[in-house]
Amino acid sequence: MAKEKYERSKPHVNIGTIGHVDHGKTTTTAAISKVLSDKGWASKVDFDQIDAAPEEKERGITINTAHIEYETEKRHYAHVDCPGHADYVKNMITGAAQMDGAILVVSAADGPMPQTREHILLSRQVGVPYIVVYLNKSDMVEDEELLELVEMEVRELLTEYGFPGDDIPVIRGSSLGALNGEEKWVEKILELMEAVDNYIPTPERAVDQPFLMPIEDVFTITGRGTVVTGRVERGVIKVGEEIEIVGIKPTTKTTCTGVEMFRKLLDQGQAGDNIGVLLRGTKKEEVERGQVLAKPGSIHPHTNFKGEVYVLTKDEGGRHTPFFTGYRPQFYFRTTDITGAVTLPDGVEMVMPGDNITMTVELIHPIAMEQGLRFAIREGGRTVASGVVSEITK
């Protein structure tokens, strides 16, 4: 049968496999690839190819990640799988592979393990919104009651971290069985993908979200006024619309009187466009790099937050020494550095290069902030850590 041409008309969703080491994440990824390729919806990727994940540099951090793509009847998926636990932590914190949802792989023979817990916690912290559970190695468990016990444990663990544990789909399968073509387990992989199709919603496209543009530069155009430039992160801005300037200084309102791209005047700019926005009645000194233009009321300025942070190792160009509570580096948000003071969690004396940690931060100026916003921690322009806002506290 001839390979069908990739239908780009299907909605696109980013997912990944998460879970404890040796519970079968990579085997499951390979099984999904094989089962869907047998249906003509994917090109098969073998376990060895996924396992030998290439090294990637994301913001200077070395991460091993395997990316594969496949389709179901309903959707096109990009799927990410990491060989090592450290790679998962880095991947999730840096947002190197944004996930709209995840498949949590738990070995039915072993039940939830420490990394199962850590991956669920990380998913909660970095904003992976939906999880589907796959109990792998179910063929190794004779006792139906034991399977039910493991399922219950996983559901309780998910509930503990704020996921709807009782409602999450749980599929019992055997990825090795599916790879070997055993019909019963092939069916379970199809059932898993059906659950992913139906339970993980298609994400809202960037262009449908409320308008936001980080300001990179500010100019005055004689006779026309102040122009700010930047890349539209999300949403649409139309000429004549009211917008807010948020961050660093008190929030002000203004009106967009013009949109320019490549020296041409447009009626609107949208997510992904590099544009200049002409602001009515705004003086050049009233706006600066590091602020954002946003749909009124859609985002607010904050100074205090909790962040989930990965600290670069010496080999990744990070610090050679630990840091302590009271550390005052620069926090790079979107387009600018802002000094902030770090408080470590109770009982944590210091943070070593290579660690991941939840820290509390107080910035010296407020910035437009929301949960899930990524940042870098820098010293003298050099990135020493990467993080994501997990909770806004003030």
Curated annotation (Swiss-Prot):
Q: The organism sits in which domain of life? A: Bacteria
Q: Where does the UniProt annotation locate this protein?
A: Cytoplasm
Q: Which GO terms describe its cellular component?
A: cytoplasm
Tell me the SUPFAM superfamilies matching this sequence: EF-Tu/eEF-1alpha/eIF2-gamma C-terminal domain (SSF50465), P-loop containing nucleoside triphosphate hydrolases (SSF52540), Translation proteins (SSF50447)
Q: Where is this region: G3?
A: 81-84
* G5: region residues: 174-176
Is-annotated flag, keyword Transit peptide?
no
Stretches the record annotates as G1: 19-26
Give the reactions, separated by semicolons, that this protein catalyses. GTP + H2O = GDP + phosphate + H(+)
Q: Which residues bind Mg(2+)?
A: 26
What InterPro entries does this protein's entry cite?
EF-Tu_GTP-bd, EF-Tu_GTPase, EFTu-like_2, EFTU_2, G_TR_CS, P-loop_NTPase, Small_GTP-bd, T_Tr_GTP-bd_dom
Region of interest (G2), ranges: 60-64
EC main group: hydrolase
The EC code for this enzyme is 3.6.5.3
Q: Which PROSITE patterns match?
A: G_TR_1, G_TR_2
UniProt-listed NCBIfam families: EF-Tu, PRK00049.1, PRK12735.1, PRK12736.1, small_GTP
Q: How does the record describe its quaternary structure?
A: Monomer.
The record's listing under HAMAP family reads: EF_Tu_B (MF_00118_B)
Write out the similarity annotation: Belongs to the TRAFAC class translation factor GTPase superfamily. Classic translation factor GTPase family. EF-Tu/EF-1A subfamily.
Q: What does this protein do?
A: GTP hydrolase that promotes the GTP-dependent binding of aminoacyl-tRNA to the A-site of ribosomes during protein biosynthesis.
Identification of the protein by name? Elongation factor Tu
Species name: Fusobacterium nucleatum subsp. nucleatum (strain ATCC 25586 / DSM 15643 / BCRC 10681 / CIP 101130 / JCM 8532 / KCTC 2640 / LMG 13131 / VPI 4355)
